[in-house]
């Protein structure tokens, strides 16, 4: 018994034979790719971040990544080292890579021909027998397969862009966490110096009171400085521990990881800040999130076309049939069977209206997203510029002034014009100004990271 073959084509005026051949060709090429769509993510990561990213689907790939991570951990980490470790080792990122595998499976499935259905009906009342055999094909599904396959391809591209955004977000988070961790470690060192100076002042005050050379009020002042310094040191150590733990988590390192080394200091401020890039060009050419929304918009256009194409007919099954009626052994009667849904109560109007509303909604959201992207870049640049000015002023004005004051008071102390407590207070103030400078440098590098992320399309900044 010959069976007609089925496939899917875009609804058009092309002859049925051409449509069938198109579907056969589509079904024949619906196979899995070697890279699972990951090569484009890897190449764009290399272009935008100059970093390696690897989808570890085998034990060999996992071992290669582990070896690269171990090599980086052998030396004091720089910011870009931490980013590279995160891109290789973060398991949440690996889970997002698996979305590519899920999406590719959907893509391949969308190109497969629908399975035929076989129906057998047997009834007998001696000496009569009634046997009906039917092999049917969902012709509508076959005719819309090219539409569905094209939609699946766009969804696959959408997933690739979403995965790339996840890569950029992780890189940005890790870079900021690194700057925070280094600044927190530096802050602990300076707070320890402040606490040591305050402790010396409190001890000296206690001895002078015991010798009858000082009053209890002045001693209480020194003791309060010492207590406050101890509290700030505890807070700094907590901040250091939390910042370090966050960096460990983003890099995908376990809590029992041997102590890794961070750089001793934050990078120095650059000589000058970068100019604001052309926002229109940056938004249209660099923003991955806008590219993703554009892909989603194109997908809705395709969905709208598919809805229009299948508006009136939702079920159309065609297939050969043969029937045997009469005494057992009677010849079969051959023919065909068509199952057609009659759009009597539902002509597809609500589905079409819904698809049109979804498309209109997507257009408005895409337009607003472009406006938001421009605003985000301007805000990020303003924060970047202000952070640079603040850090530069701390470095060039505040810290030198505090150092000069301390030097002058040392001369006055040598001339017996000020007390040792004045020197200790100056030391505390000078160290505090250096700590403020460290925090301002940290804020600058974080602002720089947020600006870079805004230009690339990380809308979470």
Model-derived features: positions:
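Soluble, cytosolic/nucleoplasmic coiled-coil alpha-helices used as oligomeric scaffolds and tethers
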Residues: 106, 113, 120, 162, ...
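Terminal intrinsically disordered/low-complexity segments used for targeting and assembly
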Residues: 2-88, 237-282, 452-461
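A ubiquitous short alpha-helical element
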Residues: 63-68, 118-123, 186-191, 262-264, ...
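Residue-level recognition of short, well-ordered coil/turn positions
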Residues: 91, 213, 288, 312, ...
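Sec/SRP-type N-terminal targeting helices
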Residues: 94-98, 111, 140-170, 192, ...
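Periplasmic alpha-helical coiled-coil/stalk elements that build and connect Gram-negative outer-membrane
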Residues: 30, 145, 161, 165-282, ...
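A small-residue-enriched
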Residues: 29-53, 84-141, 244-253, 280-365, ...
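Short segments within alpha-helical structural elements
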Residues: 228-255, 365, 369-370, 399-457
């Amino acid at each position: 018994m010959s069976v007609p073959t089925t496939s899917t084509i875009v609804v058009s005026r092309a002859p049925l034979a051409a449509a069938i051949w198109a579907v056969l060709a589509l079904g024949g090429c619906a196979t899995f790719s070697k890279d699972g769509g990951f090569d484009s993510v890897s190449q764009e990561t290399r272009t935008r971040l100059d970093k390696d990213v690897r989808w570890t689907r085998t034990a060999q790939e996992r071992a290669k990544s582990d070896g690269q991570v171990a090599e980086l951990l052998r030396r004091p980490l720089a910011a870009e080292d931490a980013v590279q470790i995160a891109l290789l080792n973060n398991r949440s990122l690996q889970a997002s890579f698996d979305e590519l595998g899920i999406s590719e499976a959907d893509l391949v499935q969308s190109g497969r021909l629908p399975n035929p259905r076989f129906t057998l009906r047997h009834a007998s009342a001696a000496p009569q027998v009634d046997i009906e055999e039917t092999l049917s094909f969902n012709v509508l599904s076959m005719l819309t397969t090219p539409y569905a396959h094209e939609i699946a391809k766009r969804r696959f591209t959408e997933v690739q862009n979403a995965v790339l955004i996840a890569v950029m977000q992780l890189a940005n988070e890790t870079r900021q966490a690194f700057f925070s961790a280094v600044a927190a470690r530096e802050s602990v060192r300076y707070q320890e110096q402040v606490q040591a100076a305050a402790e010396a002042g409190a001890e000296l005050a206690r001895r002078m009171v015991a010798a009858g050379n000082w009053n209890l009020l002045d001693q209480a002042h020194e003791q309060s400085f010492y207590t406050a310094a101890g509290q700030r040191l505890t807070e700094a150590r907590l901040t250091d521990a939390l910042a370090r733990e966050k960096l460990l988590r983003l890099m995908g390192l376990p809590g029992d990881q041997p102590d890794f080394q961070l750089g001793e200091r934050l990078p120095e401020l650059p000589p000058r800040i970068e100019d604001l890039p052309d926002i229109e060009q940056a938004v249209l050419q660099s923003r991955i999130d806008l590219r993703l929304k554009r892909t989603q918009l194109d997908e809705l256009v395709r969905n709208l076309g598919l809805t229009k194409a299948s508006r009136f007919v939702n079920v159309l099954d065609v297939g050969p049939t043969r029937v045997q009626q009469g005494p057992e052994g009677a010849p079969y009667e051959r023919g065909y069977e068509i199952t057609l849904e009659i759009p009597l109560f539902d002509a597809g109007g609500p589905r079409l209206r819904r698809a049109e509303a979804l498309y209109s909604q997507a257009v408005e959201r895409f337009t607003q997203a472009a406006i938001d992207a421009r605003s985000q870049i301007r805000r990020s640049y303003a924060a970047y510029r202000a952070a640079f000015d603040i850090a530069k002023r701390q470095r060039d004005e505040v810290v030198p002034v505090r150092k000069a004051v301390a030097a002058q008071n040392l001369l006055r102390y040598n001339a017996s014009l000020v007390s040792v407590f004045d020197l200790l207070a100056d030391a505390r103030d000078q160290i505090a100004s250096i700590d403020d400078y460290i925090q301002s440098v940290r804020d600058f590098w974080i602002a720089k990271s947020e600006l870079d992320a805004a230009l690339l399309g990380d809308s979470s900044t």
